[in-house]
Curated annotation (Swiss-Prot):
This is Tachykinin-related peptide 3. Transmembrane segments: none annotated. GO terms for cellular component: extracellular region. It is found in: Secreted. Expressed in the antennal lobe (at protein level). It comes from Pyrrhocoris apterus. Coiled coil: none annotated. Keywords: Amidation, Neuropeptide, Secreted. It comes from the Eukaryota. Its main location: secreted. The lineage of its organism: Eukaryota, Metazoa, Ecdysozoa, Arthropoda, Hexapoda. GO terms for biological process: neuropeptide signaling pathway.
Length: 10
């Protein structure tokens, strides 16, 4: 996912 935002935590 994106490097920032909710999916950036992965």
């Amino acid at each position: 996912g994106p490097s920032s935002g909710f999916f950036g935590t992965r």
